[in-house]
Swiss-Prot record:
GO terms for molecular function: rRNA binding; structural constituent of ribosome. HAMAP family: Ribosomal_bL21 (MF_01363). Keywords: Ribonucleoprotein, Ribosomal protein, RNA-binding, rRNA-binding. The keyword ATP-binding does not apply. It comes from the Bacteria. NCBIfam families: L21. One of its GO terms (cellular component) is ribosome. GO terms for biological process: translation. This is Large ribosomal subunit protein bL21. Part of the 50S ribosomal subunit. Contacts protein L20.
Amino acid sequence: MIAIIETGGKQILVKEGETIFIEKIEGAEGSKVTFDKVLLLDNKIGKPYVESAKVIGEIQKQGKAKKIVVYRHNAKSTHKRKLGHRQPYTRVKITGIVG
């Protein structure tokens, strides 16, 4: 069974037993999380969401992604700017798709 869920401003295709990386959500490691915004469930298409469908998962890890460096330089001047950013994420294992 497959589903497309909406979380963190993104749409993610999920299957039962799969591990996904999503934008950070609150919750401790090992706790259950429910996604109610299901856009597609097998052959049912929601308008905008499928009624009474939900995806259940378990939070495995809260972490930060690899650091990216943003460097800005203005030509013909001494202005330089270097910034780093690490995006927080949550790793979730999909345990069930109900609908």
